[in-house]
Amino acid sequence: MKPFVIAIDGPAASGKGTLARKIATHYHLHYLDTGLTYRGVAHALLQQKLALDDEKNALVYARELDFNTLNPALLSSHELGNAASKIAIIPTVRETLVAKQRNFAKILPGSVLDGRDIGTIVCPDADVKLYVLANVQIRAKRRYQEILKKGAQADYHEILVNLEQRDSRDITRKQSPLKQAKDAYLLDTSELSIEATFTVACALIDPIIKARIIG
């Protein structure tokens, strides 16, 4: 039996993570936020007060990283997000983590993976590919409101600039740049609620799952 794999890509704060978790729960599939794997390496470096461009130690931490220990609450900070985007441009680290992500995708009955290069690099043969995006101003507003809800201070303009910088790094990096796979369905969440986005996604996924079962 071949695992059923759903690849979800998109820029930061596009809503892909929330969508991916809902899809994984709905279809009883495993879930991996691949961004957490890069955050995990960044966190390990920062804990040891090491530079984010320390390739030797970053590679060691990438090889030792246990996906089962990834803690979203610990790794979800704004600062670690920035650090992770810098870790992600180190070729050897990316190759190591991609290999681990591919192994995760082999787990039965299947998985939902979200990130920047799932449909293009990590799982190019995924059964379903979704590319989730939204206007950068809307993404900044969502991130701003998210931070305020946690009781923390936030500056909308700073968040907007940060997202634009992250988008630029993700899109222009030489290895595994952020881009829509040719066979991915585009979901623009700019004017959609998470429930509306989920409904659209399920309408795309359901017939593919049924075809797999019948086939």
From Swiss-Prot:
Catalytic activity: CMP + ATP = CDP + ADP; dCMP + ATP = dCDP + ADP
GO cellular component: cytoplasm
Organism superkingdom: Bacteria
Recorded GO MF terms: ATP binding; CMP kinase activity; dCMP kinase activity
Keyword list, A-Z: ATP-binding, Cytoplasm, Kinase, Nucleotide-binding, Transferase
Predominant localisation class: cytoplasm
UniProt xrefs under Gene3D superfamilies: P-loop containing nucleotide triphosphate hydrolases (3.40.50.300)
Disulfide-bonded cysteines: none
InterPro entries per record: Cytidylate_kin, Cytidylate_kinase_dom, P-loop_NTPase
One biological process term in Gene Ontology: pyrimidine nucleotide metabolic process
Annotated ATP binding sites: G10, P11, A12, A13, S14, G15, K16, G17, T18
Compartment(s): Cytoplasm
EC assignment: 2.7.4.25
Family, similarity comment: Belongs to the cytidylate kinase family. Type 1 subfamily.
NCBIfam families according to UniProt: cmk
Protein name listed in UniProt: Cytidylate kinase
